[in-house]
Amino acid sequence: MSFLNLNEIKKLIREYPLRKDREIITKFIEGEKLTERELTRALHMSLPLFTLLLLNKRFERNKQLSEEEWATTKVKKLDNIGTVRNLEILPLIDFHSEGDLLTEKGVSYFIKADDLGILFDTGLNDKQKHPSPLLNNMKALGVTLEDFNYIIISHLHGDHVGGDQWVQKKMFSLSGTQVNLKHVKAFTPVPMSHPTATTKHVKGPEIIVNGIASIGSIRNPLFFFGEVYEQAIAINVERKGIVIIVGCGHQGIQKIIDRVEVLFDTPIYGIIGGLHLPIPNFPGDDPTWSGLPVFKFIVTRRPPWEPWHTDDRDYTLDYIKARNPKLVALSPHDSSMESINAFKDTFKEAYIDIKVGKTIKI
């Protein structure tokens, strides 16, 4: 079978995180004589190594498929998007806050565009409380469910749809118990449902309402969790330009910006949200999965033995800087303080902190 290719196994062994065990695993694979202790150790390690090999096979296949899809997908300009005069983004959930508002490693932003209200993602609510941190922060900030005309879900991950339990059901929720959203229309990057809200699966780029568009659901592979489809939104602000709002940035900054520049002739004014830059280290309370930090090793577009480096962050910075944006705000829910400080140093007065309760006015 192809996944047992010896050269691939040897390559994986060279990259195996537990360096002290490489020699034992190599001897085991090549059939060399092992001591009883070495054999016991090799058997303990062979299953996770074999699992990593299978995951790597799936990842490489998905990576190829996603790149082929990206290369062959043709999108047309959204010439008739229109504009909004006023735009405000109020973070309701993120990792940093003003005062004593609740924080999570999740995202939920209240977008006010002229007279329209949009809820972008619905946070994490890790303990499935009701009312959730999102609802508690809304109450403290004077935001009500009636303020939302639309909900936009960036992607189907627990920290953006209200918790992992809703991921399994392909749903989103604002709290541990579903709330009445019968007046709301939701736009999702994959087929999703809600007990009361109307939902629409967004595949390609489309205008949601005057001045606001989805750039379309973009497919990308994750090593452990298969594939993720993520959409960002573009808001055309009168006399300023396109403001991009991103959930986690699993698409990669190049695909996000390239897609926006194909869709619109209007220059990019700003970019706000998560870009997944846990470089070089994330805060010590990064949630773990099987002993590995989630944001640094698990939900990335790379194998765990190829974590993100400062070069990747610098590439992101350079790609954004080349557009001369007037506003940049990086979500702390999936990026390290080192990355946030690098953004501050690069964009100077154009940089704005994302904090729960702190309104960003465009």
Regions found by a protein language model. Give the residues of each.
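Zn-dependent metallo-beta-lactamase
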Residues: 2-114, 205-222
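Metallo-beta-lactamase
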Residues: 77, 175-233, 344, 352-361
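Conserved beta-strand hairpin/beta-sheet module of binuclear metal-dependent hydrolase folds
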Residues: 82-85, 89-141, 226, 230-245
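Structural motif
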Residues: 87-90, 117-118, 184-185, 211-213, ...
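Fold-independent oxyanion-binding glycine-rich loops
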Residues: 92-95, 122-123, 155, 188-192, ...
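Short glycine-/acidic-enriched loop or helix-start segments at secondary-structure transitions
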Residues: 130, 162-164, 170, 197-198, ...
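Active-site metal-binding motif and surrounding structural segment of the metallo-beta-lactamase
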Residues: 130-184, 262-276
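Cap/insert and terminal regions of metallo-dependent hydrolase folds
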Residues: 150, 157, 239-243, 251-357
